[in-house]
A protein has these predicted regions:
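Transmembrane alpha-helices of Major Facilitator/SLC transporters
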Residues: 3-8, 239-264, 274-287
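C-terminal ends and interior cores of transmembrane alpha-helices
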Residues: 29-43, 276-323
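Conserved MFS/SLC helix-loop-helix module at the cytosolic interface between two early adjacent transmembrane helices
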Residues: 6-42
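Intracellular juxtamembrane helix-capping segments at the cytosolic ends
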Residues: 61-75, 229, 342-357
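Glycine-rich segments within core transmembrane alpha-helices of 12-TM secondary carriers
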Residues: 80-117, 128, 143-144, 244-247, ...
Length: 440
């Protein structure tokens, strides 16, 4: 995670130097390389070197790269919809990935005579045994090949001006072979050096730092929520569907509507409104499950447990679902959080691109990871501490959860609330400073 941030901070300057298409192809190459070896290799040291490191490089490049491309290929009028559409497509990918993850786990799992589920049983392929999680990477490798083919058709060195006209941008002459690599490295270093001494850049970083508190909830969804879900709902619970699918599908429908309705509202104001909604949503998970018990044996309960999560095949069996009432606070929490996310998250991406000076978009957008990089040194240990206190594990299996396990989301929600509070309190100060610097 930290490696992702370090590489991502360098990506923008690379894009500004060699262009979008070449940078994207480099990224996809690293992802192909990592997914190939993670499909076959089982040695932890080799997985780290041949899998995790190239995967971190590939992923780190993609995020800033897409934001830079949207900035170059949209006008001021279409930027909100452009970033909104990207956010929709990204979450469509998450939704498909979440469904595939749970489907693959279920398809390749084995249940013994005692009813114990082994999720990682796997299968034989090409005369070799692949575990369930190796099969995830085999399938991912196939999808990445499709991405590589599509990337070859991208046009480079063009952008759209504010009048909506297609403009060709000059291609930088970097020489050939080793000289090209050397000149690219020099240009990247020069770009980074020039940007980090600008006052505008540090004001920009200050604003982004205030958004960290609510953005850290995403980190907890990735690292804290899976263990929380397994501990509270039981092993084999469809935790990928509960967050990954529900969140992504809602985003797909909500973001275009919100983007269109609010396209003339400032990004900063939308960030405040959306972060309030998302922050307060965390506290829904703290509500006692007994409050929602009446919803289980209703048409909504049938929709959730039979049609969506596929936990049982008939209404009569719903009361037998392990920790059935515990699902409801989490579902409503994620639902409301996602509504807030659809308001603030795409606009944060747009705000990041709006502030970046022309010609330095890539460097600014990539270096916007800097506060997020610093936050990981705090939020990672926070996640580990919360899990240890409220939902402990031993040898990869959950121990009995604390009766106060929902307090995990109280502390996460309290942290998230700092974002709208600080954005509101310091907004005028930062905007005034940005205005002064832009006039110089």
């Amino acid at each position: 995670s930290i490696l992702l941030s370090i590489i991502g901070m360098l990506t923008g300057a690379v894009v500004d130097t060699i262009g979008i298409r070449k940078t994207l192809l480099i990224s996809i190459f690293f992802l192909l390389f990592s997914r190939f070896f993670m499909s076959f290799v089982t040695n932890p040291a080799l997985i780290f070197v041949l899998g995790f490191i190239p995967m971190a490089i590939g992923f780190a490049v993609v995020g800033p790269l897409v934001s830079i491309a949207i900035k170059k290929y949209t006008t001021k009028e279409t930027a909100a919809m452009g970033f909104g559409l990207f956010y929709v497509l990204m979450n469509l990918g998450y939704a498909i990935g979440s469904m595939l993850f749970d489907k693959i786990r279920g398809f390749f799992s084995v249940t013994d005579a005692a009813g114990v589920v082994n999720e990682n049983a796997g299968t034989m392929l090409f005369g070799l045994h692949f575990t369930t999680y190796q099969m995830v990477f085999v399938i991912g490798f196939g999808f990445t090949i499709i991405s590589l083919i599509v990337a070859f058709f991208i046009r480079d060195h063009i952008e759209i001006n504010d009048e909506g006209e297609l403009v060709k941008t000059p291609k930088k002459e970097l020489g050939s072979g080793l000289e090209s690599v050397k000149n690219s490295a020099i240009d990247v270093a020069t770009m980074l050096k020039n940007v980090v001494v600008e006052k505008t850049f540090w004001i920009y970083i200050g604003i982004l730092a205030l958004t960290l508190f609510v953005r850290c909830v995403f980190f907890h969804f990735s690292y804290t929520f899976p263990k929380y879900g397994i501990s509270v709902l039981g092993e084999g619970a469809p935790i990928g569907n509960i967050y990954g699918f529900l969140n992504s599908v809602l985003i797909i429908f909500a973001v275009p509507i919100v983007s269109y309705i609010t396209k003339k509202t400032s990004s900063y104001k939308m960030m405040i409104i959306g972060s309030v909604v998302s922050s307060l949503a965390c506290f829904i998970a703290v509500i006692p499950p007994s409050f929602f018990e009446g919803l289980t044996n209703t048409p909504l309960g049938e929709l959730v447990f039979i049609k969506w999560l596929n936990l049982v095949d008939s209404p009569e069996k719903m009361s037998g679902i392990t920790a059935v009432s515990e699902y409801w606070p989490l579902i409503f929490f994620i639902f409301i959080f996602t509504i807030g996310e659809s308001i603030w998250s795409p606009r944060l991406m747009q705000f990041t691109a709006e502030i970046a000076p022309k010609g330095k978009e890539g460097t600014y957008i990539a270096l916007s990871i800097l506060p997020w990089f610093a936050a990981k040194f705090f939020v990672g240990p926070m996640s580990g501490l919360l899990i240890k206190i409220y939902t402990p594990f031993e040898n990869g299996h959950p121990l009995p959860a604390s009766p106060d396990h929902a307090m995990i989301w109280f502390w996460i929600g309290a942290m998230a609330l700092l974002t709208p509070v600080t954005l509101f309190c310091f907004g005028k100060f930062f905007m005034r400073k940005l205005s002064v610097e832009s006039e110089k």
